[in-house]
Amino acid sequence: MISPAQDPYASRTDRSSAIIARQDPVVYGEGKFADALSADQVQSYERDGFLLLENLFSDEEVAALLAEVERMTRDPAIVRREEAITEPGSNAVRSIFMVHVLSPILGRLVRDPRLANAARQILGSEVYVHQSRANMKPGFKGKEFYWHSDFETWHVEDGMPSMRALSCSVLLTDNNETNGPLMLVPGSHRQFISCVGETPRDHYKQSLKKQEYGVPDPVSLQLLAEQGGISTMTGKAGSVVFFDCNTMHGSNSNISPWPRANVFMVYNSMENTLNPPKYGLNPRPEHIATRQAFKAVRPLDSLKLVER
């Protein structure tokens, strides 16, 4: 086991919070492993820690994806599974995990070359699905997701060694300024925020509803935001946001009348598979962090998302 003193990204120890310079590349292999993105797009991702591609999916594709996600949220057999997470204080579905396994069309989505090849290009290797989920924010009552770095959680609770993973968020509804869109801090991916507080056992059972550990301190957050600002990922349904595993992000609650729904695919490099979790923690379930049943994503030969 690597001690906190030897871990470049030690977090949730008895030490105080700290800002630590990133030790890993942002784009691996000079972005030449695949060719889904232009050189300018790769450069933008490397600089900011994220990339918004507008109108990547057609209206027909979006309609099929949204209908499937809505079906899943109404399916009692899915809602009562451990993969379904409800909002704090209600039975409204907040997230459904492992959607690429539970749904054939979402299984094709994770292999769509527009997503998978972009991930392979940025991460410089073959990739597998570390996690997939559908996130819903119903109008008037969708709750916020507080600021966090995914890598902080994946490093501590899942044993992910390095910052060689990314998320892509496929917008299934219009994301506007009022319905709780994703917010990211440009440039924050180059700094790791070490958090305080020992992780409780089975922390995931509460953190997926409301995260209280692995949360960056206000002083560090303010510094990152003053340096980089805050970018709001607004766009039409069918747009996609790719963002680095260490980019600081969050979203406000949705008190507007307009619901928001996104599907997230998390790709991890096949050269960055999980170690045991830190500090003797038990591994999180497979539907949250793929540890056993993983294989390289094989991109579809052509765009076959909607079968006719």
UniProtKB/Swiss-Prot annotation:
Query: Which domain of life does the protein's organism represent?
Result: Bacteria
GO biological process annotations for this chain's record?
A: ectoine catabolic process
Per the UniProt entry, the signal peptide is: none
Q: Does the keyword Iron apply?
A: yes
Residues at the site labelled Important for ectoine stabilization: 154
Which InterPro entries does this UniProt record tie to the protein?
EctD, Phytyl_CoA_dOase-like
For the ligand (Fe cation), the binding residues are 148, 150, 249
A Pfam family matched in the record: PhyH
* Primary enzyme class: oxidoreductase
Q: Catalytic activity annotated for this protein?
A: L-ectoine + 2-oxoglutarate + O2 = 5-hydroxyectoine + succinate + CO2
Q: Per UniProt, where does L-ectoine bind?
A: 131
Q: Which cofactor does it need?
A: Fe(2+)
Q: Which UniProt keywords apply?
A: Dioxygenase, Iron, Metal-binding, Oxidoreductase
Binding-site positions, 2-oxoglutarate: 137
Q: Which Gene3D superfamilies match?
A: q2cbj1_9rhob like domain
Functionally, this protein is described as follows: Involved in the biosynthesis of 5-hydroxyectoine, called compatible solute, which helps organisms to survive extreme osmotic stress by acting as a highly soluble organic osmolyte. Catalyzes the 2-oxoglutarate-dependent selective hydroxylation of L-ectoine to yield (4S,5S)-5-hydroxyectoine.
Family, as annotated: Belongs to the PhyH family. EctD subfamily.
Q: Which NCBIfam families match?
A: ectoine_ThpD (TIGR02408)
Subunit structure of this entry? Homodimer.
Write the protein's name.
Answer: Ectoine dioxygenase
Q: What is the lineage of its organism?
A: Bacteria, Pseudomonadati, Pseudomonadota, Betaproteobacteria, Burkholderiales
Gene name of the encoded protein: ectD
